[in-house]
Design a protein with these regions (language model features):
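Short catalytic micro-motifs in class I SAM-dependent methyltransferases
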Residues: 108-109
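A conserved beta-strand element that flanks and buttresses the S-adenosyl-L-methionine
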Residues: 105
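A short glycine-rich, Lys/Arg-flanked "PGG" loop and its adjoining helix->strand segment in the class I
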Residues: 117-129
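Conserved small/polar residues in nucleotide/adenosyl-binding loops
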Residues: 152-159
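Class I SAM-dependent methyltransferase SAM/SAH-binding core
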Residues: 48-93
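Conserved class I S-adenosyl-L-methionine
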Residues: 1-36, 39-47, 50, 54, 141-142, ...
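Acidic carboxylate diad motif detector
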Residues: 135-137
Length: 160
């Protein structure tokens, strides 16, 4: 609850910090857009919806969730698409049926979780057979700017 309260308080200022790293987000969105084209997407830890808003035109539909009601309020205030739905959810206990989504995205969050394995297991559960789990993470590099990591360490999950 303490972390959730932090993010609720931080929500209105979060976009200021994201704007400072537009280049890193733009590069990430370029990589993600082709992967979500015409697919059902679940974004976990959406924050203010930067990724969800950035891929909405490509995806068939997007469910974007976050544990912080404050973050979701900000994300909803910028939403203008019927394909995009925001809700407050704990990513360790998702209300969706098994195999509900063709793509699950959890960006910049695993290092913040007390139980990352539980969140990954839950993401795999709601992922359709043959689906795609995208878990990008930024790292601070150079002069305090965010830089995308060009390699990925993935935990294998069977979805068949």
């Amino acid at each position: 609850m303490e972390k959730q309260s932090f993010w609720d308080r931080y929500a209105r200022r979060y976009s200021h910090f994201v704007r400072a790293d537009q280049e890193a987000y733009a590069q990430m969105l370029e990589w993600i857009r082709p992967a979500v084209r015409d697919r059902t997407v679940l974004e976990l830890a959406t924050g203010t919806g930067v990724i969800a808003h950035g891929i909405v035109h490509e995806a068939a539909s997007i469910e974007a969730t976050d544990a912080s009601a404050g973050m979701i309020d900000v994300a909803r205030s910028h939403s203008h698409s019927r394909k995009l739905h925001f809700s407050v959810q704990d990513m360790r206990y998702l209300p969706y049926a098994d195999g509900s989504f063709e793509v699950v995205i959890a960006a910049n969050v695993l290092h913040l979780l007390p139980e990352p394995d539980k969140a990954l297991d839950e993401a795999a559960r709601v992922l359709a057979p043959g689906g795609l789990l995208i878990v990008p993470t930024f790292t601070h590099a150079g002069e305090g700017r965010l830089a995308t990591v060009s390699y990925t360490h993935l935990r294998a999950h069977e979805t068949s």
